[in-house]
């Protein structure tokens, strides 16, 4: 916003675009978290006698240390979950600001 207290349509549109981009990020990160959860569950339920493979680029490598892989997956899932929480907080903040700006715009 400029010197005026009344928000411009450009200000409101910029916030709407930012909000839309954040929602896209939240959806993407949420899907990734879900995939990690499924992978962790599958790995935990896997018969220890059966080999487990990990994708590295275009090749599959057999995993020697399942516990290490499981901890790595859990750590990545936790990091994504924390990032998701921060994005949700940011979304809420921007949504409130958007609503306030839209209300100010309509009043004047």
Where are these regions (language model features)?
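Short, charge-rich amphipathic alpha-helices with coiled-coil/heptad character
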Residues: 1-20
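A structural signal for alpha-helical segments
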Residues: 7-10, 24, 31, 68
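Short amphipathic alpha-helical/adjacent loop interface patches that line ligand
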Residues: 19, 33, 77, 84, ...
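Short, basic/low-complexity N-terminal boundary segments at the transition from targeting/disordered tails
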Residues: 20-41
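Amphipathic alpha-helical coiled-coil segments
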Residues: 26, 70-90
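Charged, heptad-repeat coiled-coil alpha-helices that serve as long linker/dimerization "arms"
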Residues: 29-30, 46-49, 84-85
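Short coil/loop "hinge" linkers that interrupt or connect long alpha-helical coiled-coils or helical hairpins
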Residues: 42-68
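Non-transmembrane, heptad-repeat alpha-helical coiled-coil rod segments
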Residues: 45, 89-108
């Amino acid at each position: 916003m400029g010197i005026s207290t009344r928000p411009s349509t450009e200000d409101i549109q910029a916030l709407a675009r930012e909000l839309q981009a954040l929602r896209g990020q939240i959806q993407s990160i949420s899907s990734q978290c879900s995939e990690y959860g499924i992978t962790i569950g599958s790995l935990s339920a896997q018969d220890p006698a059966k080999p487990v493979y990990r994708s590295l680029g275009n090749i599959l490598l057999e995993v020697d240390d399942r516990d290490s892989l499981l901890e790595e997956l859990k750590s990545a899932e936790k990091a994504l979950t924390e990032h998701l929480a921060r994005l949700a907080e940011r979304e809420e903040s921007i949504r409130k600001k958007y609503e306030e700006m839209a209300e100010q715009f309509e009043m004047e």
